[in-house]
Amino acid sequence: MQRYNNNLNKKNKNEKNDGFTCFLREIMVILQTDTVLFLFCKKNEGRTVRTDKNYNNRNMKKIWVMMLATLMVSSTMMAGNVKKSTTLPIEGEIVKASHPMIQYVGRVSFAKNPDVASFNYPGTTIEASFQGSSLKMLCRPKTGYFMAQIDGCEPFKVGFNAERDSVVTLAAALPKGVHHAKVMYVIEGLFRKPEFRGFVLDKGCQLVEAPALPERKIEFIGNSITCGYGVESINMSDPFEDETENHWLTYANIVSDSLKAQHTSISRSGIGVYRNYNGPKTGDADNMPWQYEYTLFDQHDEKWDFAKYQPQLVCINLGTNDLSTKNYDIQLYEKNYRMFIKTVRSKYPHAKIVMLTGPMLGEKESSKQRTVLDRICADANKTDKNIYRFDFSFQKGDLGYGASWHPSMLQHRKMAAELLPFLRKLMNWN
């Protein structure tokens, strides 16, 4: 016993005497002896009683495994006494999100910090051209998922999900020269509070002027279908998850890309034009017409400046949530939709506006919706000839379903294939 006590009391004068260090020292001493010491602490006497028992070498391996497991548990319990690790400093040229050569498409706010871009609508896009052979992206930890594309090549998904996950490599080992990066936020960031903080370039490199964004501009106003809810899932019974939502794969992005147009997506799962999903029959106050006025969804301290983005085309896909459960009032739906059309027209006086019906509603509710929108369009056309109608075909399951019966990736491609010819002709965008 004397050898145990002497070894236990030998401490480096620079060593920190916290609980975890003492525990580790005890384990190391035990492993160096031929004796395993079982420690029993009597709660009421405040002292330690030690009893010895010799074990042969064959049993020692089992004991070591048990002690190692104990060490792991103890280290977790004593985590408060252990200093957190420090990451290596970021090497390279840091370019802030406020850099004038970074291009944004979508509703982005710099109100809280002039060097940090805040956003939470899917489809928000960041583009830049840069010198060098690598590119890193800086975001607030847990910002969520992006699709990234370098020099127009195959897009790939990146994520910021851990507590300290703030730097992600987008490109490495590129040929030296000038390259272009496009990054799109592909989920709904309402609860994540996403922030883009900048890029990291190779030492001595900088951003250069990027190619001009397309002159063609579209705005999609919609619900979970336009967001891309569950599009990466292949099981209709799957719940909502950020991991399976992806706006890049939606009809909205496919159509915009095919038309060589930039687009914004003002969309949110569960939103309605008068009543959100399964809301009261009288309607919800926080519906799309109310949220539409603000830069960020459900954050109402900053009104959006509609002069920043004036689309030539607006596509509205709302009504699935209003009518998807039986507790709805079709007259209130029509009344609010008429008012919302007037709001959109006031923001975009020269845009063509297309009212869409989606593929998810049942036949009865879909028929009611189409009748209402046809009537709104006909009435509007008496004074405004730039209001139009379009119906997607119903999803039948032959192309599969995404999560919660939402359109699958193949269904979104079909939707894009249906909508594209109509919009090409309407806009004369060949």
Predicted regions and their residues:
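Structural recognition of the beta-strand scaffold that forms the well-ordered cores
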Residues: K217-I221, T226, H263-S267, Q312-N317, ...
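Short, positively charged and aromatic/hydrophobic N-terminal segments
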Residues: Y4-N5, E26-I30, K42, R47-R50, ...
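Acidic/polar hotspots within intrinsically disordered regions
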Residues: N14-D18, N44
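Conserved SGNH/GDSL esterase-like catalytic core that processes O-acyl groups on lipids
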Residues: G123, L190-F191, V231, S237-K335, ...
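Sec-exported extracytoplasmic/periplasmic mature domains
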Residues: T226, K260, T264, G319, ...
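Extracellular serine-dependent O-acyl
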Residues: K352-T357, E365-G402, Q411-N430
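N-terminal secretory targeting modules
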Residues: I30, T35, F40, V49, ...
